[in-house]
UniProtKB/Swiss-Prot annotation:
Subcellular location field: Cell membrane; Endosome membrane; Cytoplasm, Cytoskeleton, Actin patch
UniProt protein name: Actin cytoskeleton-regulatory complex protein PAN1
Gene Ontology CC annotations of this record: actin cortical patch; endosome membrane; plasma membrane
Primary location class: membrane
WH2 domain sequence ranges: 1415-1432
Species of origin: Debaryomyces hansenii (strain ATCC 36239 / CBS 767 / BCRC 21394 / JCM 1990 / NBRC 0083 / IGC 2968)
Keywords on record: Actin-binding, Cell membrane, Coiled coil, Cytoplasm, Cytoskeleton, Endocytosis, Endosome, Membrane, Repeat
GO BP terms in the entry: endocytosis; endosomal transport
């Protein structure tokens, strides 16, 4: 057989030999090359890799039909070209060998009948294994499974290796020692030859992995079932049926089709398709046992014997699902009627018989319904079902006779459940019930994976998951198995019983899963690596796809629940055979025990019982043995001589001595071990004591578990109990404040307009929303209409109802109040979030884990330990120093704070209040904590610092506990800010501090000139500052410049760091200020242009109008006299407006005592808007500050020419109306001083005295816009009034009293830095002049820059009162402040107005203290004199905007 190879050795050149077996022998390949390239043209050596890839499908096809193997080797029909060789070996195999003479090379026949499992050997590449397989098939004759020794020798000798080497390779490859090699052994031998040719040494022993793979491969070949039908039918009742089958079909299942004698070709064709699906040898047995009902039907009709029913019925319990599939195919064939004569033979049979005649009761139904053709055919189908039910439910047989007419309708219903039942007995694989509630997406699975389905993958993925995802189990449920079997049947149209890899790619590709997932699923399902899936394996793969679509991970190996029963049975059989072979042959096996062990005899094992009587079951041989043993012992002892006995005694003594010596040695070694252990224990104790002493010297800062728990409980109490309550209270207070503001504004409007009745906000609005609801658009539209009416009334000169205007004002106030409340609520929420962050940070450090708690309880307290170890732990605890409790530490810290106060050498020592310094020192001391209490104090200080930083980012500062703590804190911050903003280095700050004695002397002089009530006020302020020094310590990190732990460092470094921080903050504030001013300037310019147009129209109209309108305000002079209601209203306003700014600046020294105790300004102390306002516009920050870069107004000087023009226009009687604020809406053009009449001016002074900012003839629109530039934009009506009062009032009385002194001292005072704690004003404050009389509330400070000096006033100006006049006595409680001389222009001056001045001093000198008797004539004369002025200084124009102007006693 191999001579052609030897003859053709010389016909091939070495290059052809090398390329032909590239994976094999590298040196000498001429022995193997002709065998593999004999099919091809020698000029085409690259075709061999294509041959290797084609060897897998012939193996798969060969398992279906033997004829396909004969056609496979002929796939080289077109060998002269390269392309047919590459593709033809896979695709053109069935047409091979038809033209064998196309190539002149000798033909080599390949044994295509040889069955080699498609298993991979990991130590050989796939190309090499395919080449080895081809060589093996050509060398093995047909009908054999192994290559003989001679053939293997001839092949191996072609490698050119030494015979000794080949002998070693043979010993390693022939694992069974049979003298022949199976394919895995042959491949191993060739692989070893390759290793030897490469120069690698041969292993003396096969690696375990190689050996296991080869043995498994050999087992797979050995246990493969032969494909011969004769061998399969042998020793079975189907042998006779197989002999009579049609030889053309070549199918052993054809006898079943012959049972239908007259049925024609329809049943036979249906059976022909089924056997082709079970062509594999392993699956044919399953089909044979799975189709027993068909032979029962065929033999039941008289054409065959009953004998074949016996094995078919007993074997039908393995694969029942095929029965309903076949019956459904046979029902239309049975309806044709040829089966009627067959049923007559069963008329007399008993329907209740069992055994081989189980078909008889089913066939009795045919005798009763012979005339009904369709019913007879249906009942035959039902027979198959009942036979399938016999092994499962025997109780169904008696019911079948009575329900035969009904059961014909139940046929499709019964075939359904039968599909899931044959997968196993209850409790086995595939028989799990569906969970309650079902599993998701099963209907979508069934519809999506059918061949005709073209649905997108999104539909399938959307159907998965959901709440039912948790019901998906590892096992395959009945419902799933039915669906998967239906999908399998739909794709297996040829009934092959398998689904190939290409079809599986199309099926599983519809799932939309990634390729790695599909590869893993295929590897798990195709356990035998056959490249195809049967029905059970397909169900496993579909179930894995289903689980993956539901989001579950794929397992690394197949779980036991998903292993198919067929695979289990085969694997169990293989394991059993392997174990029997491993245990050895029959020679080494133990002798078989007597007695039968078959199932016909049951043998009880009495040894299972605990007690068995000695008398029972006593065997004779046992008694004989006992008696013989008893006789032997004395005979054996009696046979010993005395010498032997002595020898035994001596030996025993020697053994006993040896045992004693061993015991003694063991005792000595134990004592030595104990001594060493004690020494080691002592040394460890000494080390532990040393470490404990070190720990005692350096107290741990972490604190004990108990202290941490205590602090954690306190933290939880504060953050979970206190803070939420405080936050809710703050929100409630904000709501109350908003409500109170609205009510207060309503009361103000009511006082100003007694006839006005507030209307409902929604009364005049027509709602366009749902159900007539009023929407925001409706409100905006209504407001626009009202404003339009007002404008039209102003243009036409007609009077407009003031009630609507007041309602609009009220609505605007409500809206502003709501927006302000929302902003404050947002800030409070931010503070709450910051508190939450701080709580999380503290909780992370204070939380105690269970592990720490248990370890502390064990090793710190000595619990649950050995007594000796616990004693040692207590000894260590006794050496620990006693720690102070948290209360003691807090007390010591609080006591240490005043002591550390004088040690501060910081530049801010003279500026920051005592409580600030103490807090900073305490925070520094807390950095050097030695106890847990100190650590907790340090944590609190750090938390406060972080809180202050967060608030600073929001533009807020921390509150003090006392009433005016926020102003002191803010002014302290302003001091530090202005200090470092005005000085480039700390030396400049020191030079500024040197000027403090002058300032102190000035303060002393001023205090000496003050009356007693302001001194009492000053003492109260000192007491408040002292209280704040004790209560305001938690805010110290913010006040000290946010340096809680840096005092120990170099002070110059501290100053530089703080200077950088302050400069950065200054730049941010300047940027915000510039942005705000730019926006306001744009708005003002637009309003100003609009106002100018209106003024021009009004001017033209007034020039053309009659003089009757000018006489109207004169009649109102008498009605606006100094009445009681007017004085009461003015008194109320004088108390409410000035005090708001009195509290914010620290110039309260000049305020009366009665008004200092008023609680009204506290609303602005707690208002974040007020704090923002103070930072940008309070007198403490920008009143008269030439050197302050934060709030220095630079753009306001540019408006001076326009202001002068506007002033002259106002003096000529032009209107003052604009839409800048709500206060200005109260006065229309008709009410303004548009005619410059003295009576009209007086009516404005006394009639509009309840308004906070009355517009007199001395105020121009330009001036108002200029003033508004310094005012932050707020929505609150009250804040607008206060701000206008601040920024538009200019104190002039001091200038009138001592103009020269002020000019000389103002510059020096601006440069000086206040140090006194009693007057903690910013460094850019100028010292206040001598205070006005105590009964006049001081005006708030202004921030207007010095304008150019105005022209000298006319000579008819009233004389300025002398500043040396003694102040009048303080008025009684409740008295209103005296009437000021509001419109008297002061003499020219060059210095800016001083803060804290009262513009009413001149007025107070002239007005009587009791109030009420005012010289109206003199006042009107002054007003007339002022109205005739041509130009007024900018600062004097603001007199009319003062908060107390127009107030009547």
């Amino acid at each position: 057989m191999y001579n052609p190879y030897q003859q053709q050795q010389a016909a091939y050149n070495p290059q052809q030999q090398q390329t032909g077996f590239a994976g094999g022998f590298n040196q000498q390949q001429q022995y193997v090359q002709p065998q593999q390239t004999g099919y091809y043209n020698p000029n085409q050596p690259p075709s061999l890799p294509n041959q290797a890839t084609g060897f897998y499908q012939p193996q798969q096809q060969g398992m279906f039909n033997a004829s396909s193997f004969q056609n496979q080797p002929t796939g080289f029909a077109q060998q002269p070209s390269i392309q047919p060789q590459q593709t033809g070996y896979v695709q053109t195999q069935p047409t091979g060998f038809q033209q064998p003479g196309t190539n002149s090379a000798p033909t080599v026949t390949e044994n295509s009948e040889l069955k080699i499992p498609s298993m991979r050997l990991s130590f050989i590449t796939a190309a090499d294994q395919s080449k080895f397989e081809h060589l093996f098939r050509t060398a093995v004759p047909k009908g054999e499974q192994a290559i003989s020794g001679d053939s293997a020798r001839d092949i191996l000798l072609r490698s050119g290796l030494q015979p000794i080497t080949l002998a070693e390779i043979w010993s390693l490859a022939d694992t069974n020692k049979s003298g022949s090699l199976l394919f895995p052994e042959f491949a191993l031998a060739l692989h070893l030859c390759n290793l030897s040719l490469k120069g690698d040494p041969l292993p003396t022993m096969l690696p375990e992995k190689w050996s296991n793979e080869v043995k498994s491969f050999v087992d797979a070949i050995s246990f493969s079932v032969p494909e011969n039908p004769a061998n399969i039918l042998s020793n079975t009742p189907f042998a006779s049926s197989g002999a009579s089958s049609n030889p053309i079909n070549n199918d052993w299942m054809a006898p079943q089709a012959t049972g239908f004698n007259n049925s024609g070709a329809v049943p036979s064709t249906s059976f022909q398709a089924q056997p082709t699906g079970f062509g594999a040898s392993q699956e044919m047995m399953a089909q044979r046992t799975g189709n027993p009902p068909l032979p029962q039907q065929a033999t039941g009709f008289g054409s065959n014997n009953v004998a074949p029913l016996l094995p078919q019925r007993t074997g039908g319990g393995t694969l029942i699902p095929l029965q309903p599939q076949q019956t459904s195919n046979l029902i239309p064939a049975q309806k044709t009627g040829p089966l009627q004569p067959q049923t007559t033979g069963f008329q007399t049979q008993n329907p209740h018989q069992t055994g081989p005649g189980a078909l008889q009761p089913q066939s009795t139904g045919f005798a009763q319904r012979m005339n009904n053709g369709p019913l007879q055919a249906q009942t035959t189908g039902f027979q198959q079902q009942t036979t399938g039910f016999q092994p499962q439910s025997t109780g169904f047989q008696p019911q079948s006779t009575g329900f035969q007419p009904q059961s014909t309708g139940f046929q499709p219903q019964q075939t359904g459940p039968l599909q899931a039942q044959p997968t196993g007995k209850p409790g086995q694989w595939g028989f799990v019930s569906t969970p309650t509630g079902g599993i998701p997406g099963m209907n979508a699975m069934e519809q999506h994976f059918l061949p005709s389905s073209q649905l997108p993958t999104n539909n399938l993925q959307n159907a998965m998951g959901g709440s039912l995802k948790t019901n998906v189990t590892w096992s395959i449920t009945k419902q799933e198995k039915q669906i998967y079997d239906g999908v399998f049947s739909a794709w297996d149209s040829r009934n092959k019983g398998f689904i190939d890899g290409e079809v599986a790619i199309n099926i599983f590709g519809k799932s939309g899963l990634a390729r790695p997932d599909l590869e893993s699923i295929w590897n798990l399902a195709d356990t035998n690596n056959r490249g195809k899936l049967n029905k059970d394996e397909f169900a496993v793969a579909m179930h894995l796809v289903y689980r993956r679509l539901n989001g579950f991970d794929l397992p690394l190996r197949l779980p036991p629940e998903l292993v198919p029963p067929s695979t289990k049975h085969i694997q169990d059989s293989m394991d059993t055979l392997k174990n029997s072979l491993k245990s050895g042959s029959a020679k080494s096996s133990p002798p078989v025990k007597p007695g039968k062990t078959d199932g016909k005899r049951y043998k009880n094992d009495d040894s299972n019982f605990g007690y068995v009587s000695n008398v029972r079951h006593r065997k004779k041989n046992v008694s004989n043995n006992d008696s013989s043993n008893g006789d032997e012992k004395p005979s054996h002892n009696s046979d010993l001589t005395i010498a032997d006995l002595k020898k035994l005694v001596r030996e025993k003594k020697i053994l006993l001595d040896a045992v004693d010596a061993e015991d003694q040695d063991a005792a000595i070694s134990n004592r030595q071990m104990e001594s060493r252990n004690y020494q080691e224990i002592d040394s460890l104790k000494q080390q532990i004591r040393k470490i404990q002493s070190q720990l005692n010297d350096n107290v741990s800062s972490s604190g004990s578990i108990g202290e941490r728990k205590q602090l954690m409980d306190k933290l939880n109490y504060l953050t979970r109990d206190k803070v939420p309550g405080l936050i809710s209270k703050i929100h409630q207070v904000n709501k109350d404040i908003a409500t109170s503001k609205v009510e207060l504004f309503k009361l103000k409007l009511s006082k100003e307009n007694p006839d006005w009745q507030p209307e409902d906000a929604e009364a005049g609005i027509v709602g366009t929303g749902v159900n007539g609801e009023v929407t925001d658009a409706d409100r905006q539209k209504f407001k626009s209409k009202q404003l339009l009416k007002q404008r039209m009334a102003a243009l036409t000169g007609k009077s407009h109802g003031s009630g609507n205007e007041l309602d609009v004002k009220l609505h605007q106030e409500i809206k502003n109040t709501r927006s302000e409340g929302e902003i404050q609520s947002g800030m409070i929420n931010d503070i709450e979030a910051s508190i939450k962050d701080l709580e999380d940070g503290c909780a992370a450090n204070l939380q105690v884990t269970n592990k720490e708690e248990v370890g502390t309880d064990k090793w710190e307290n000595g619990n649950n330990l050995n007594e000796e170890v616990a004693k040692f732990v207590r000894e260590l605890n006794s050496s620990k120093p006693k720690q102070q409790s948290s209360s003691q530490v807090n007390s010591t810290l609080s006591q240490g704070q005043p002591q550390t106060q004088p040690q501060s050498n910081n530049v801010e020592a003279g500026i920051v209040s005592p409580q600030v310094t103490g807090a900073s020192d305490s925070s520094t001391a807390s950095h050097e904590y030695r106890t847990p209490e100190e650590r907790s104090a340090y944590i609190k200080a750090q938390a406060e610092k972080r809180m202050n930083e967060r608030l600073a980012k929001l533009g807020l500062t921390r509150h003090m506990t006392s009433g005016s703590s926020s102003t002191i804190e803010q002014q302290t911050q302003n001091k530090t800010t202005s200090l470092y903003a005005n000085s480039e280095t700390s030396k400049n700050a020191e030079r500024k501090l040197e000027s403090q004695p002058e300032y102190q002397q000035q303060q002393q002089q001023q205090q000496q000139q003050q009356p007693p009530p302001p001194q009492r006020q000053q003492s109260q302020q000192e007491a408040q500052l002292q209280d704040k020094g004790t209560n305001g310590q938690p805010d110290s990190p913010r006040q000290v410049g946010q340096k809680p732990t840096e005092i120990m460092d170099n002070e110059s470094d501290d100053d530089n760091e703080e200077y950088v921080a302050l400069m950065k903050k200054k730049e941010e504030m300047e940027a915000r200020e510039r942005k705000r001013k730019l926006k306001k300037k744009q708005d003002k310019e637009a309003r100003l242009e609009k106002l100018k147009r209106e003024m021009e129209e009004l001017k033209k109209k007034e020039e053309a109008g009659d003089s009757s309108d000018d006489e109207e305000p004169i009649t109102e002079v008498a009605s606006y006299g100094p009445s009681g209601s007017a004085s009461k209203s003015s008194t109320t306003k004088s108390i409410e407006q000035p005090i708001v700014e009195e509290k914010t600046n620290e110039e309260q020294i000049a305020a009366p005592v009665v008004e200092a105790d008023t609680f009204v300004p506290k609303t602005h102390d707690n208002n974040p808007f007020a704090r923002i306002q103070n930072n940008s516009s309070t007198p403490g920050s920008n009143n008269g500050s030439k050197d302050n870069l934060f709030f220095k107004p630079e753009k306001e000087v540019k408006l001076d020419p326009k202001k002068a023009a506007a002033q002259r226009a106002s003096q000529r009687g032009l209107g003052d109306f604009n839409d800048w604020s709500d206060e200005e809406e109260n006065s229309s053009e008709d009410e303004g001083p548009n005619r410059a009449g003295a009576a009209q001016l007086a009516s404005l002074l006394f009639g509009g005295m309840s308004q906070p900012v009355p517009k007199s003839s001395t105020v121009t629109p330009n001036q108002e816009f200029h003033d508004a530039e310094d005012i932050p934009h707020f929505d609150s009506q009250e804040s607008k009034e206060n701000n206008n009062g601040e920024y538009t009032s200019q104190p002039t009385s001091v200038i009138q009293e001592k103009p020269d002194a002020i000019d000389s001292t103002s510059e020096a005072q601006v440069k000086s830095i206040p140090v006194e704690v009693e007057a903690p004003s910013p460094d850019n404050f100028t010292p206040p002049p001598p205070p006005p009389p105590s009964n006049i509330p001081p005006l708030p400070n202004t921030s207007a820059p010095p304008p150019p000096p105005p022209p000298p006033p006319p000579m008819d100006t009233p004389p300025i009162p002398s500043s040396s006049a003694p102040p009048p006595p303080p008025p009684p409680p409740g008295a209103a402040p005296p009437l000021p001389n509001a419109s008297v222009p002061p003499p020219p001056r060059g210095a800016p107005p001083l803060p804290g001045d009262s513009s009413l001093s001149s007025g107070t000198k002239q007005a009587p203290p009791s109030g009420g008797n005012v010289d109206i004539g003199a006042l009107l004369g002054q007003i007339k004199t002022g109205s005739s002025l041509k130009k007024v200084d900018e600062n004097e124009k603001r007199i009319a905007d003062g908060a107390v102007v127009g107030r009547v006693l």
